[in-house]
Amino acid sequence: MLSGTDKHGFAVLRSSPLPELEAVMHYMRHERTGLELVWIERAEANRTFGIAFPTLPEDDTGVFHILEHSVLCGSELYRVKEPFVELMKTSMNTFLNAMTFPDKTYYPISSRNSKDFINLMRVYLDAVFRPLIYEKSEIFRQEGWHYELAEDGTLSRKGVVYNEMRGAFADADELEEDAIMRALYPDTPYRFVSGGDPEHIPELTYERFLDFHRRFYSPSNAYVYLDGDVDIDEVLGILDGEYLSGFAAGERIPVPELQRPVRAGEQRVVYELPAEEDPRERYRLAWGRVAGEITDRVRMTAMQLLCNVLCGNNQSVLTREMLAAGLGEAVSMMLWDGCAQPFIKLEVRNISEDKLARAGEKLRAVLGGLAENGLDRRELEAAMANLEFQMRERDFGYYPQGLGISFGVLDSWLHGGEPEALVEVGTLFDTLRARMEEGYFEELIRSVLLENPHACEVVMVPSHTAGEERRERDAKELERLAASWSEAERGRVRSQQAALDAWQGSSDSPEALAALPRLELSDISPEPEEYPTRADELGGVTLLRHELPASGISYVSLYFDITGLGGEETAAVSFLSELLGKVDTAEHPAQELSRLTQLHCGNMSFSVDVYDNSADSYRAKLTARVSALESGIGEALGLLAEVLRSSRLDSEKEVTDILRQKRTGMMQQLMNNGHVSAIGRAGSQLAAGPAANEWANGYDYYCWLKRQNAAPDFAALSGELAALAKRVIGRRGLTVSVTGMPCPAVDEAVAALLAALPEGESVSGPGIAARGVRREGIEIPSDVGYAAMGALGGEFDGRWQLAGRVVSLEYLWNAVRVQGGAYGTGMVTRVNGFDGCYSYRDPSAAKTLGIYEKVPEFLRAFAASGADIAGLITGAISAGEPLLTARAKGEEADDLYFRGITHEMRRERRAQMLAGTNADLAAVAEELESIFARPGVCVLAPRAELGRCALDEISTL
């Protein structure tokens, strides 16, 4: 296909086989502009395209983050306000987004539909090279920042990125890592916050914003990535004929020079703490250590392994020593590899100020001893086995595999390395095992962690008042600024505000919308993807088999029924799931168990999961999951049986350490994913399943952890956990799921596992009921909030799925995100009948609740308009069928099984969507009008905003 050296103006520089992917990587350069391109040619139906630009910040205004948002707000060919949203509405994409990194901006898409893939690629190319930002300053003001003058003269700032970063800066981890990068890279672009510091975002002018696009978004500074079964002749023809031929060669932004070593000393950063938290034990100590260069793969992988061996869990050698000494609640170590010179962050979390010095001394003493006396070779071998499994598995979770691979390609390519250098595993671990015998890892401890001339320390200082002081400071600055303006300046701001309001409130013309490429409904299969499931019985236990190619890996899940438990017991089982695999068993101490698990398992995890298909019933499961190579599944399931059968729950130190860590982690999770917390909490007022999930994974579980931590009675807790383990872990009520290809060794291992388990007891009881409708608020330390409102609707079907998509993208996106300044928003429609709306990083939660109340009115008017909804149908179907790995397909099949959703039911819902009409939407609007009369409400926000939400009750995180 690529014979010859020139194709549509592209010279093929070389082609390199990638046997692990059964692929060939072609490396090309566009001769006229210098644009570089790689294509991983392989038989992969999910095609990926991405275009990346090295974007090196020169200040903290977040200009490249704002550009990332803004170029997707209209272009020369696609002159609609938000092509990105139109694509969300109308495409069958498996990925559609854009990303700002500290030194690059990346615009990737993927799709299983070849026509859709080309459509998406065209829109993205026009967006980055020909955006409407030069014609429409309103784009900058909407996505970046702008002033707003209220009728009473009160001045405020708004903007999507501005509010996003206000929320990000409520995260202590974000503040800590920003401080480390400022300290370690004082002479490079990495010292700046690429996402933007809210204090500095308002310093960015429209003119400077445009200048950065001119300088950095040229074909000569672009890198294109392709993966999969791509029609390369068509793609190169589009690139050259429609875009690159119109550009001359320009300047390629050089790779930034490496930072010379600096000893930055100690930095102190204040962060906001929830009001009920005692600040005395909430200091953090973080070491920042530059680890080398990102293109040095052996060294970077070795540092990942060191992170695991030293601090991978509570039994890892450095963490264990620190916790035993009472120095910190948790100790972690990670490789931060999003830059040319990755750094190690070694953190001791939740410690008193008077112990900071001792913590630093203890870290040095333990690391010094390890460097001198050597690491446990068995621990290193286990860590290598586990990391090699993960790297060869290439399961990137939310990201499609082609996109996940692209991150490694760009890491090497944009920093002067070969694009294929980080793609395959090859002999990497053979090299590391050989170097292990030469003392390589001990030398890294010395050179990177102990004697590194390129280092800093950051102390995070907790404060109850920091957030309020900042908000008062901002308010006074805005008040002073407004008072200093002349009437002409006020008029200019009001004029810009009016222009922005008019633009945001305007509709795209039919001609502009028609120009956007889109699929026809006839391009969409009426058949949803089927997840193969065969239900068998083995030893009285239900066995679900999902026969799927999985590269020689088996995925085994055990589901122990806990449906009848009450709230307190469900929370205790959820905490039990945190302990399993982390505490001693009758056969092995926790440290040895951890080593064996890493050696023999790709993954071993435990959780509590809730499945429902109606408002008044649900199924709750204690879930155990294991993945391993088929050849090693016997050892893996043997370890799982040991953990389930004989975990020791009576070790006070280990259990209370995990309790405190989980409580802190849950607090951070509730703040960072407040929209999930809010919508889940609202749903729990109305339906039993969400109420059970609150006790298993939500705010009720967090409150249970707080109570256990505040008034510890270890004997009672240990006794309850042991009694629950005996009650729920057994063959009675158990369902086992196996995903992978048929394999006798797997069948034998599963049979042996079941034989090793006790019979168990029946878990009976009334379970957990819905909490009852109310308007509740949870105070969080943040400048932005998360608002949710919902109600129980009629029977879930394809009409409701379509209506949720229409409300999300035709109404909430514009009203809450575009005009309201929230970073995210949407409507969910769930199989249990719950229908609700949420917002994310929202500066005006109270106003947003009012917008939700008008959803029925909007939907009724939309249906009456007779709008063409074919594209929205396409997008709704796509949203319900994401790209899944074999592992994820098995888990989705289990989910459907427990909810009682058959393939025929899914086919019927798809048929309902494909046949959807405005009359269907009108019918849903009438139902929404009725159910939204008394909805459930939950808002997570700062205290002042909660006071504007007319709430019945307020608690504090």
Regions found by a protein language model. Give the residues of each.
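His/Glu-based metal-binding/catalytic segments typifying zinc-dependent metallopeptidases
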Residues: 41-43, 50-52, 162, 166, ...
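M16 family metallopeptidases and their MPP-like homologs
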Residues: 46-56, 82-130, 137-148, 174-199, ...
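Long, compositionally biased intrinsically disordered regions
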Residues: 443-530, 681-779, 910-911, 915, ...
